[in-house]
Amino acid sequence: MSLKSETRVNTSTLQKIAADMSNLIENLDTRELHFEGEEVEYDASPGDPKAQEGCIPFSSIYNTQGFKEPNIQTYLSGCPIKAQVLEVERFTSTSRVPSINLYTIELTHGEFTWQVKRKFKHFQEFHRELLKYKAFIRIPIPTKRHTFRRQNVKEEPREMPSLPRSSENAIQEEQFFGRRKQLEDYLTKILKMPMYRNYHATTEFLDVSQLSFIHDLGPKGLEGMIMKRSGGHRIPGVNCCGHGRACYRWSKRWLIVKDSFLLYMKPDSGAIAFVLLVDKEFRVKVGRKETETKYGLRIDNLSRTLILKCNSYRHARWWGGAIEEFIRKHGADFLKDHRFGSYAALHENTLAKWYVNAKGYFEDIANAMEEASEEIFITDWWLSPEIFLKRPVVEGNRWRLDCILKRKAQQGVRIFIMLYKEVELALGINSEYSKRTLMRLHPNIKVMRHPDHVSSSVYLWAHHEKLVIIDQSVAFVGGIDLAYGRWDDNEHRLTDVGSVKRVTSGLSLGSLTAASVESMESLSLKDKHEFHKKEPISKIVDETDMKLKGIGKSRKFSKFSLYRQLHRHHLHNADSISSIDSTSSYFSHCRSHQNLIHGLKPHLKLFHPSSESEQGLTRHSTDTGSIRSVQTGVGELHGETRFWHGKDYCNFVFKDWVQLDKPFADFIDRYSTPRMPWHDIGSVVHGKAARDVARHFIQRWNFTKIMKPKYRSLSYPFLLPKSQATAHELRYQVPGAVPAKVQLLRSAADWSAGIKHHEESIHAAYIHVIENSKHYIYIENQFFISCADDKVVFNKVGDRIAQRILKAHREGQRYRVYIVIPLLPGFEGDISTGGGNALQAIMHFNYRTMCRGESSILEQLKPELGNKWINYISFCGLRTHAELEGNLVTELIYVHSKLLIADDNTVIIGSANINDRSMLGKRDSEMAVIVQDTETVPSVMDGKEYQAGRFARDLRLECFRLVLGYLSDPSEDLQDPVSDKFFKEIWVSTAARNATIYDKVFRCLPNDEVHNLIQLRDFINKPILAKEDALRAEEELRKIRGFLVQFPLYFLSEENLLPSVGTKEAIVPMEVWT
């Protein structure tokens, strides 16, 4: 045998002896051992560096360890534990069984106070455990855990406290006070000795754990070791054998009860194994009849039936009563039935803010993410990792979503993202790419996708809510995904080609002055257009590459070919920071060709000094665009940054997204096709309302973790809701928020959130607000599919609108309804040929709600109002125009909002469309917030003085000014939304005038002149003024004000727009469209 192998044998033998010795000592019976009078060991300072912080951070819930580990942090640093024996309960018996004394011990540790009940025999068992531990710690066993314990123990001369030896039965009634004092002193001394205080037997005796003293988890609740039975989960579509007793498995777990949830942990690993939220179905039952278990305890909520087993019936009764009492005291709000059937309570004095369009919304999300210290929760229907949250881009990649998340993850923030897992054949949002991209950024970023379509049998419904939650204290709720195409501002631009101007080669960067800037040779749109007609793209690209190889030598290099290359070349390097403005696409192209790098690099120079790396972008001092300069052999080219880069420049009616794994490559030609502007609404709430949003996210996350086996590993942790008791402690507050009454609403069901009864509180809130509105309602929505026939459509929103108008007419009341929806549904299709089948199907149900068929709003109104319905309700869309490459172009503005404003005092903002998918609860999952003003400002309503809510009125005015074109012109008074002057002379008149001008100039579709497909073919073949006479067209377009246009109610009114038999859309169930 070699020396090396002999050493290996000796080492393994030593390890075996050490393990045997450790097991022997752990199982040592020390009942006869008494080490009275001996010195004890004492550690004056905590060993865990985290303990120096003075409190246990909330993030420690993700770092729990096995209960017997020596270095876990259970207690608050530098904070003593005070023990007091409050009372003694004496249980007597007529039999020969000795009387039992039960001591109630109150413990205080910092802000936390709790009670435990112990018999004297428990003290004796506890004392023996400590004696065994003391003997064990003296033996130098060569194991890592034992060595750590010994190294962290310092000897100090102190006597080991001893328990009274006299029997409980020998104590007289008058001696109880003395016994209480003895036990109290014993505990006080033990708890002053870190060696014993941190021992797992002590923490179990005191009913404490690593999660006991975390401030944001609320008051110290009930804790203790129990036996837990497997099963009881409600997982839709899965029929497991959990109902047969043979399938049950019992496991030892540490149960923790908090103010709004309970959980249990695995003692050996410290892992949180399940979280059960308190809700209105929360019940605790005791007994064999209820639990089918001797000494059983049953806990129910909307998601699970949990069966526990105790040591005795009395123990089970105590657990049941204590849990109910604690939850009633600290979590009563979660047990109640709330308004609209919502899972969330109405919260007073809650800070809230609205957003019109994504510019401010994205900026505030970016700023809030920067302030995150513990957690970021995100859930979206679609998420694009490479989008920029702040634009124009002037700080490189700093505000790109994936870069923000990576930066925060590196700082220790835990990031949890849930994405809708689409049916890939039906949708091209490529959530797998999003997940893969985000997960590889950092281990602190966890992404789940749901649902699994086969196992859950969910093919038709989607997770549609859009939420961003920061530290469970600030929550963004609305209709805006963090995805391509969503960013927009109040200008709703149609074009984004940037601009390039050339300065003569004699000018140097240093000598560039205001005068020289004015003398730049500019490329007009017309010149560029003429050039594009003459030069094919392939020739330009080839010529540019050829000239670049000899840059600085040849003077034949064309400014046009460089311009073309700067603006039209597709990016190949998706990770390049430089891929985000008009000139940097050219740089990226050159970097991908190694033979050009060395020749070109000396000639590329930024006009402004950059704070980023070579790949970074320049900063600038204005908000209009980033001025760039490229030094070439033909002088200086100065450009303005783009707002939409690569896939972000989109027009999904013209063409749906493709190749999402190439984020900075254009997929439509921005020189010939205008983008589709995006109009949307968002909100942010703080405090208790934000806690409610986080609670919904946590419920969905934990449900998905249980349901999908791939997420059951410890790398995907269970999430815990923070306590409402600490919700007022805001570490960050979004600027501009105002106080109001706020309640969260949702659409949720078994498939989406794992709950027993579906919730449709958004639908109930819409109905309530419409029925109780007194003056007006203003609706912006992506869809308008309602008016129930109880066969195909079931939501009642449209019916309630019609009934409210009829009520106003009968009472002689002035009442207005404003409906703003997209002129066309957001599906790919050529409307000049009638549109695609999906587009037509949505058009059918929109028209069925508004004006076609006996169930429609107008058909419900006409029998009583005739044509006077026009005085009560207005249907509108949004449209804009621009010049693109020398041509006049127009495009609808896609209304994606989910907004309801009533009476300038109530607002609903969320992700829910007005259709059955969003409203019924059993279908798509949705989230919304209802805000009711408590702060008022003087206003006018129906010609009379009126106290309008600050939140609702300001939002309504912002929407009106935007769509009517009065954002920068306060000449018209928009205060009174009900008066005839506003409704007829401003709103209806502006919409009609704009629609007429657009029809005259562009012959827009949809159009009221077109009733069938034959008329449609004739309509599109007629000459268009914008092409025939551009000057006259421009003169007409100058009369346009704002974006508002009348909705064409009679477009294709003679056609059946439902999918034709034989098409794939006709095979799909009708519920998909409604």
Curated annotation (Swiss-Prot):
Residues of the PLD phosphodiesterase domain: 459-486, 891-918
Catalytic: annotated span: 463-928
Signal peptide residue numbers: none
EC number: 3.1.4.4
S-palmitoyl cysteine lipid sites: 240-241
Membrane topology, as annotated: Lipid-anchor
Gene3D superfamilies reported for this sequence: Endonuclease Chain A, Phox-like domain, Pleckstrin-homology domain (PH domain)/Phosphotyrosine-binding domain (PTB)
Regulation: Stimulated by phosphatidylinositol 4,5-bisphosphate and phosphatidylinositol 3,4,5-trisphosphate, activated by the phosphokinase C-alpha, by the ADP-ribosylation factor-1 (ARF-1), and to a lesser extent by GTP-binding proteins: RHO A, RAC-1 and CDC42. Inhibited by oleate.
Entry-linked SMART domains: PH, PLDc, PX
PX domain location: 81-212
List of residues that carry Phosphoserine: 499, 561, 629
GO cellular component: endoplasmic reticulum membrane; endosome; Golgi apparatus; Golgi membrane; late endosome membrane; perinuclear region of cytoplasm
Entries under CDD domains matching the protein: PH_PLD, PLDc_vPLD1_1, PLDc_vPLD1_2, PX_PLD1
Molecular function per GO: phosphatidylinositol binding; phospholipase D activity
Catalytic activity, as annotated: a 1,2-diacyl-sn-glycero-3-phosphocholine + H2O = a 1,2-diacyl-sn-glycero-3-phosphate + choline + H(+); ethanol + a 1,2-diacyl-sn-glycero-3-phosphocholine = 1,2-diacyl-sn-glycero-3-phosphoethanol + choline; 1,2-dihexadecanoyl-sn-glycero-3-phosphocholine + H2O = 1,2-dihexadecanoyl-sn-glycero-3-phosphate + choline + H(+)
Localization: Cytoplasm, Perinuclear region; Endoplasmic reticulum membrane; Golgi apparatus membrane; Late endosome membrane
Disease per record: Defects in Pld1 may result in coa which is associated with coat color dilution and white spotting. It is also associated with platelet-storage pool deficiency characterized by decreased levels in serotonin and dense granules.
Function (record text): Function as phospholipase selectivefor phosphatidylcholine. Implicated as a critical step in numerous cellular pathways, including signal transduction, membrane trafficking, and the regulation of mitosis. May be involved in the regulation of perinuclear intravesicular membrane traffic.
Subunit structure: Interacts with PIP5K1B.
Protein's recorded name: Phospholipase D1
Gene: Pld1
